[in-house]
Each structure stands twice: as C-alpha cells, then as structure tokens.
C-alpha cells in the first residue's frame, strides 16, 4: 500500500538500489542520446535515485511520486544538493490527476508500471507529455511467477498489478498508445531472497 512506501522511504536508498539506479541510468545513456538541454520527467521516481545518476547528463528534472514519504526524501536531496536546485517534486498520479501541461524530451519510469493496474491512460499521458522527438524509457521486471512481491503486502488493492511484463506484450500496449518501441533485455539483475530477476529497458518514440 502507499503507506508502506511512506514507511520505507527513509531507509529506501540501500546499496542494491543505488547500484540498480546506476545500471539503469547507464543503460538509458547507452540507448538514448542524452543532451544537457533535455527536460526529464521521472514517474514513480521514489527518492530520485535514477534522476541523481542522470542529473549531470540531462537538463531540468521533474520527479513525480504518489508517496509523500518518497517525495520528502527527494525534496531533502534537492535541499542538500544531491539533486539540482531546479528539480521539481510532484505528487502527480497520471491515472487520476489528468495530464500536466508541461512537456519533456525524456520520460523515465523504473520499477513502477507493474504497480499500475490500468496502464492505457498512463501511457496516453506519457504520449501527450513527450515532445515529438522525445523518448520514453521504461525499466521493469521481465515477466516472473509472482514471487518477487510475495509477502510484501503488495497484493492488497493498491500496488501490485502485474508480475512483470513480457516486453513484447508491453511493446504492443505502447503501440496502442502511439509508440514505436525497442527492447533491451537483462540490463540488470535484481536479487531478492537469493533469486535473480532480470530487468528490461524499453525505449519508445512517438510514431509520426
């Protein structure tokens, strides 16, 4: 539930998550020509770990996360200088809040979409928020058997909607939203309870 993310926020940034953020940022940098002018929107940004890793390679950063606890940690990082002073921290929930007016050259969402039961409105919002040449980068679990979130209270209503994604199926959902997508598998392994779970990177551009 959302409150469980609030509770976890203060101790969220452990070594494994920092390493994951670094691997994700490097995979994105390898797949997308990053520019210091690019406006970055990270959805489900948590404490801003991925944005921290990308900050020196992109322009102004906007972080969105529905968890107040996560936003508080992200805002503390801005105050402390680990994220640029111009960084904005939003509580926007694209599934319910409507689409922001702002436009972005780069939208990143990491380990977030598997929490979203109703993807089409969120993918449509991404399409609207992205500039014509912009890139949407999705990093998530490759389809798994449900064990990744077993016992984390994720099944209770909010939270866990998908046991990861078959990247091809996600690409089809993205096509419905007007995107062309290329997928890179196994950009990083997340280890949990002694098992390794691969992450994929999907990079999408809007169809002209």
PLM features: what roles do these ranges have?
Residues 1-36, 50, 73, 80-81, ...:
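Conserved class I S-adenosyl-L-methionine
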Residues 13-19, 135-203:
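C-terminal alpha-helical "lid/dimerization" subdomain adjacent to the S-adenosyl-L-methionine
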Residues 39, 60, 133-135:
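Short glycine-centered segments of the SAM/dcSAM-binding site in methyltransferase folds
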Residues 41-97:
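Class I SAM-dependent methyltransferase SAM/SAH-binding core
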Residues 64, 110-113, 139:
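Residues lining the SAM
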Residues 95-107:
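A short acidic, Gly/Pro-enriched loop at the edge of an enzyme's catalytic core
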Residues 105-118:
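A short SAM/SAH-binding and catalytic strip from SAM-dependent methyltransferases
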Residues 120-132:
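A short glycine-rich, Lys/Arg-flanked "PGG" loop and its adjoining helix->strand segment in the class I
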């Amino acid at each position: 539930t959302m409150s469980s993310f609030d509770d976890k926020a203060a101790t969220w940034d452990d070594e494994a998550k920092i390493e994951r953020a670094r691997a994700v940022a490097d995979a994105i940098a390898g797949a997308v020509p990053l520019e210091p002018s690019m406006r970055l929107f990270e959805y489900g940004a948590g404490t801003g770990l991925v944005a921290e890793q990308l900050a020196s390679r992109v322009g102004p950063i906007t972080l969105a996360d529905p968890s107040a606890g996560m936003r508080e940690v992200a805002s503390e990082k801005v105050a402390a200088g680990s994220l640029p002073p111009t960084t904005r921290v939003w509580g926007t929930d694209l599934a319910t809040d409507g689409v922001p007016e702002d436009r972005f050259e780069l939208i990143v969402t990491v380990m977030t979409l598997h929490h979203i039961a109703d993807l089409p409105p969120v993918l449509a919002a991404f399409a609207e928020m992205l500039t014509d040449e912009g890139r949407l980068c999705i990093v998530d679990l490759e389809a798994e058997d449900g064990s990744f979130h077993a016992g984390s209270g994720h099944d209770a209503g909010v939270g866990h909607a998908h046991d990861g994604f078959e990247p091809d199926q996600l690409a089809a959902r993205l096509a419905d939203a007007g995107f062309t997508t290329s997928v890179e598998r196994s950009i990083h392994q997340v280890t949990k309870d002694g098992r390794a779970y691969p992450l994929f990177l999907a990079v999408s551009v809007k169809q002209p």
